[in-house]
Amino acid sequence: MQTSPLLESLMEALRCLPGVGPKSAQRMAFHLLQRDRSGGMRLAQALTRAMSEIGHCCDCRTFTEEERCTICANARRQQNGQICVVESPADIHAIEQTGQFAGRYFVLMGHLSPLDGIGPMDIGLDRLEERLSQEPISEVILATNPTVEGEATANYIAEICAQYDIAASRIAHGVPVGGELEMVDGTTLSHSIAGRQKIHY
């Protein structure tokens, strides 16, 4: 069945989103055209502005339309002395929602993966090392993902921290709150046992 070239183009464009296949893209396109054209126009305008105006923070590399993001520009955060290293800007959002961290961040935009040709320079470790050498940083909290690549990246950064006599710590990984022990995978359970804490009364 032949369809409008513009409709085909819209569906193809929507497929660039994660988890969106041909059927989902078709449903989205038909919904916007049939029921929510004003929403489609708002989406188009927001996408156009975001793609042209959002760049990276000069300090932490997260997304921002300013030269420096609001977290890095916060004087209280600057005095904290802690930097939390994460793999993506989405990780910052997740950590900020906990309200448990009051320092600044550094976004790798990925992780080390020699098999894929991704080395230290590709994830900005040269810029991180520059910050470690120039700023009064007391601790680097490594919050990379609990994967083989994430662990390798954390270990690599910990070695850099040691060169500058800066404390490096790894976020704890373990059994999720509300989870059942029998449903937890072996690797997670191993991390939980290794990272156990004493109970103080």
Swiss-Prot record:
Residues 81-176 form the Toprim domain. One of its GO terms (molecular function) is zinc ion binding. It comes from the Bacteria. CDD domains: TOPRIM_recR. The keyword DNA repair applies. SUPFAM superfamilies: Recombination protein RecR (SSF111304). The keyword Zinc-finger applies. A zinc finger (C4-type) spans 57-72. InterPro entries: DNA_Rcmb_RecR, Rcmb_RecR, Rcmb_RecR_Znf, TOPRIM_dom, TOPRIM_RecR. GO terms for biological process: DNA recombination; DNA repair. Keywords: DNA damage, DNA recombination, DNA repair, Metal-binding, Zinc, Zinc-finger. May play a role in DNA repair. It seems to be involved in an RecBC-independent recombinational process of DNA repair. It may act with RecF and RecO. Belongs to the RecR family. This is Recombination protein RecR.
